[in-house]
């Protein structure tokens, strides 16, 4: 059953080995606090831009995978929490480490981008959604892209989970991840530099989180 593993969870045993992974969920209030503080108090200095950005048109269709990121994040978090706790631990360790590095970059290298269109060629519901996103999600603290980093973290998690080892699941996860990464530049939320930075950070942290246990087994 879905909740069998947590059926005897209470305040007295929440710190036990069986349940202490739940404290990783404290990542979210800490993350959101850092997000709000950096948005409010960090003044951007460096403009992130690449000539490649000029060749990428705005395309509102990418709102779909961009918003899908939130559902993808919720799915991986909830599924691993209940059905694959080792993967949950790795995923949230990845989120914690990469977020600390990302926010440190935002503070030490306060950045922004000026890629958003002033006007929109088309007028439809997807453009309206994007206008609302622009109001909520500012054009500051963009490099590296958290959308990209978290998406790749989800991809690593699924690919390293026995529950998602089929070719179908792996293909779907790759397609979703690539679509989300492309959405960040086609919606003018990020520069291509932000993608490269996000990929670089994710790949650099990958072996320390996802290959740690495998390397220990080989040594034994």
Placement of each model-derived feature along the sequence:
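Membrane-interface loops
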Residues: 39-52, 81-164
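Residues within membrane-spanning alpha-helices of integral membrane proteins
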Residues: 63, 70-73, 96, 100, ...
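Aromatic-anchored segments of alpha-helical transmembrane domains
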Residues: 32-34, 99-108, 175-186
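Alpha-helical transmembrane segments of integral membrane proteins
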Residues: 19-27, 89-97, 168-173, 193
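Membrane-helix interfacial "entry" motifs
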Residues: 12-20, 55-59, 82, 86-87, ...
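Membrane-embedded catalytic cores of phosphoryl/pyrophosphoryl-handling enzymes
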Residues: 131-220
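Hydrophobic faces of alpha-helical transmembrane segments in multi-pass integral membrane proteins
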Residues: 26, 30, 34, 93, ...
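N-terminal transmembrane-helix/juxtamembrane module of multi-pass inner/ER membrane proteins
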Residues: 1-74, 118-121, 130
